[in-house]
Design a protein with these regions (language model features):
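Short glycine-/aliphatic-rich beta-strand segments at the starts of folded cytosolic domains
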Residues: 9-40
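Charge-rich, low-aromatic oligomerization/scaffolding segments with amphipathic character
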Residues: 78-97
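Conserved hydrophobic positions within beta-strands
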Residues: 121-124, 184
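FAD-binding FR-type
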Residues: 135-255, 317, 390-391, 395, ...
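Reductase modules of NAD(P)H-dependent flavoproteins
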Residues: 285-409
Length: 409
């Protein structure tokens, strides 16, 4: 087993520069495109690295290696998940280099954990067998981050699965890690019912175990749900995202609309607003399939009882009493029920709406030269736009904020 390479990343638009702690070429650089051979036994480091990068991210179309700098170009702008994936490929270049073999024994598994994992699973509250509230404690303290932001969790592909599905792994992928981004959640209150402090040594996540489908085999959660308190995993040290309370004024009305575990970042922001003693009204609406899919109802009940400006509303779509009369979040807006629950009109001049969950609920439009083009299925974005609201777009901050948050891919 070779040593991990230390890597620093600098993404700039569609190009990212990765600086390594050792030279990978001589004085002459090497430029490579995806048409290099799929397999290359005995390939030199630049060719092997490029092949692995192309396998890991089909949007990468050019790799240039010169000494200790790797320049990688994508057909789309680099995001945090893509940067972490490429960094992982480069860091592991000399792990099993040239062998094409997977780890096979307990000692190798443990060595991979030592080299790749940087955090401990410190708390699990299993709301049901497929829905966890869990906390992760990093080995080193993390910098403060904003409520609503997200980071990455990962486990190695060498870890066992909780189901019988077979991973469709690429060559050399068995010693790499399955990664997924998760918004940070919050239980909001402690055991005595007091608001939690803004920063804690551990980080909370709200996670559903994703089951294999006909076309998609989830990689992370089937492994995660075999873990227990004290087990090790990887957690990204960078927390990012624009789904935050930026621009919210103390007297603004705040409406949180989410589906399923999309409730996670809403919880973190609600706790922050209450810590700030926010004066405006706060409404939190969560839509799930069954009432048993709600893991934070007790905490919200305490907040509703304590804070007169806070309201928590849940709707379910598959419980027996709703058969034949399903109600979705969009229906609450159409009927004006959401304004009754808020206790105030949806006034775009003094209201912020936060959307997290099923993309069909959000209904994010495409921005074209002719204007906004909304999906065929009516989503909340279109409903609010027609009421005079402005949807976040790139660096332009509006009063409709969104985080598309769907099942594992």
């Amino acid at each position: 087993m070779g040593q991990l390479i230390q890597v620093e990343a600098s993404p700039m638009g569609q190009v990212a520069l990765f600086s390594t702690d050792r030279s990978l070429t001589g004085q002459d650089g090497v430029s490579l495109t995806p048409d290099i051979p799929e397999t290359s036994d005995g390939a030199d480091p630049p060719h092997e690295l490029a092949r692995r990068l192309f396998d890991a991210d089909r949007l990468i179309d050019h790799v240039h290696v010169l000494s200790n700098t790797v320049s990688v170009r994508r057909r789309q702008t680099w995001d945090d998940e893509a940067v972490e994936r490429a960094r992982d490929v480069i860091a592991n270049l000399f792990v099993y280099y040239g062998t094409g073999s997977a780890p096979t024994d307990a000692d190798e598994f443990e060595q991979l954990r030592v080299e790749n994992y940087n955090a401990t699973l410190s708390h699990i509250r299993a709301h049901n067998e497929d829905l966890w509230v869990m906390r992760v404690t990093p080995d080193e303290p993390i910098d403060p981050f904003l409520p609503g932001q997200y980071t990455t969790l990962a486990l190695g592909y060498w870890e066992p699965r909780a189901d019988e599905a077979r991973d469709n792994l690429k060559p050399d992928q068995d010693h790499k890690m399955a990664r997924r981004s998760y918004s940070v959640s919050s239980s909001m209150i402690d055991e005595s019912g007091q608001l939690l402090p803004p920063h804690s040594p551990d980080v909370e996540f709200y996670i559903v175990k994703v089951k294999p489908g006909e076309e998609e085999i989830p990689a992370l959660t089937p492994r995660l749900f075999l873990k227990g308190v004290g087990d090790r995993l990887y957690m990204g040290r960078k927390f990012t995202g624009h789904y935050t309370l930026e621009g919210v004024k103390p007297d603004d009305s705040i409406v949180f609309l989410s589906t399923g575990t999309g409730e996670a970042p809403q919880n973190a922001m609600i706790a922050e607003l209450l810590r700030r003693e926010h004066r405006g009204r706060i409404l939190d609406v969560v839509c799930v399939r069954y009432r048993s899919d709600l893991a934070y109802t007790e905490q919200h009940a305490v907040l509703v009882d304590r804070y007169p400006t806070y309201r928590y509303v849940t709707i379910t779509t598959r419980d027996p009493e709703n058969e034949g009369k399903k109600v979705y979040i969009q229906d609450l807006i159409t009927s004006s029920q959401i304004e009754k629950d808020l206790g105030a009109p949806l006034d775009p001049h003094r209201t912020h709406v936060f959307l997290c969950g099923n993309p069909s609920m959000i209904g994010l439009p495409k921005w074209t030269e002719e204007g906004l083009v909304f999906p065929e299925t009516l989503g909340v974005c279109q409903q609010l736009y027609e009421k005079g609201f402005t949807i976040d777009h790139r660096k332009d901050r509006g009063n409709v904020h969104y985080e598309e948050y769907w099942t594992e891919r």
